[in-house]
Curated annotation (Swiss-Prot):
Catalyzes the ATP-dependent phosphorylation of N-acetyl-L-glutamate. Keywords: Amino-acid biosynthesis, Arginine biosynthesis, ATP-binding, Cytoplasm, Kinase, Nucleotide-binding, Transferase. Its main location: cytoplasm. This is Acetylglutamate kinase. One of its GO terms (molecular function) is acetylglutamate kinase activity. The record marks K12, K221 as: Transition state stabilizer. It is found in: Cytoplasm. Substrate binds at G48, G49, R70, N162. It catalyses: N-acetyl-L-glutamate + ATP = N-acetyl-L-glutamyl 5-phosphate + ADP. It is an enzyme of class 2 (transferase). Pfam families: AA_kinase.
């Protein structure tokens, strides 16, 4: 493998991909094939809300959300951390290993990768992550492994915290000085004629929201992506995992979705 001078790439994996073995296999297979010829360092950050929802239903625990964020009572965090840092992380790691990758399962707390503190007392054990020390993560990458990082973190006092996976990915990318792609069910932002918009600024997005081109759940995704770009201080990309043949282009630094520009 040849080392490139490209910045590392953090891929936040979300949406239905997490529950679809075939999709995961296509993604990990594409990473394995890409890394045989080029060594751009890649790390995965994941959530796993669907697993948590299933577990909460089985345990007859109520799921409450505030402004789209899951309320995590402190007494429930062991269960939620088990689902995310345990089951979801090992399912992804297992699939990556099956597809020929040397995968390492990590959390935001490992090696002090991210600092995490309580976001809002009303949300309970929900944390906000900020970039920390990437030394351990860099060592894993330098060893040729694929880090798969759950969005569970620890505070300075050792309290487990559930961090929104998009926000966790921003913090990891910040720690690594990496580029960030939010990979999901959505291919990017479409204009009024159904064509993909290649780049989007906050002003352009506001105009499209006013004109009702961007509507409903997409408004939340767009605002989150713009916030991520501002937090990171560099463009971030929203793209889909639905076209595996395009993933190699993405790993190489080409845009296949919509790039969100920081202010």
């Amino acid at each position: 493998m040849t080392q490139t001078n490209q910045a590392p790439l953090v891929i936040k994996l979300g949406g239905a991909a997490l529950s679809c073995t075939q999709t995961l296999s296509q993604l990990f297979g594409a990473i394995a094939a890409y890394q045989k010829s080029a060594q751009r360092q890649i790390a995965i950050v994941h959530g796993g809300g669907y697993l948590v929802d299933e577990l909460m239903t089985k345990l007859q625990l109520e799921t409450v959300k505030k402004n789209g964020l899951r309320v995590t009572p402190y007494e429930q965090i062991p269960v939620i951390a088990g689902a995310l840092a345990g089951t979801a992380n090992k399912l992804l790691q297992g699939q990556a290993i099956a597809d020929g990758l040397n995968a390492v399962g990590l959390s935001l707390a490992d090696g002090g990768l991210c600092h995490v503190e309580e976001l809002d007392p009303e949300l309970g054990a929900v944390g906000k992550a900020s970039p920390g020390d990437s030394t351990l993560l860099q060592a894993v990458l330098n060893a040729g492994a694929l880090p798969i990082i759950s969005s569970i973190g620890l505070t300075e006092k050792g309290q487990m915290m559930n961090v929104n996976a998009d926000q966790a990915a921003v913090a990891v990318a910040g720690a690594l000085d990496a580029e960030l792609v939010l990979l999901s069910d959505v291919s990017g932002v479409l204009d009024g004629k159904g064509h993909l918009i290649k780049t989007l600024s906050e002003q352009e997005a506001d105009a499209l929201i006013q004109g009702q081109v961007i509507t409903d759940g997409m408004i939340v995704k767009v605002k989150a992506a713009l916030e991520a770009a501002n937090d990171l201080g560099r463009p971030i990309e929203v793209a889909t995992w639905r076209y595996p043949e395009k993933l190699t282009q993405l790993f190489a630094g080409e845009s296949i979705g919509t790039q969100f520009l920081p202010q």
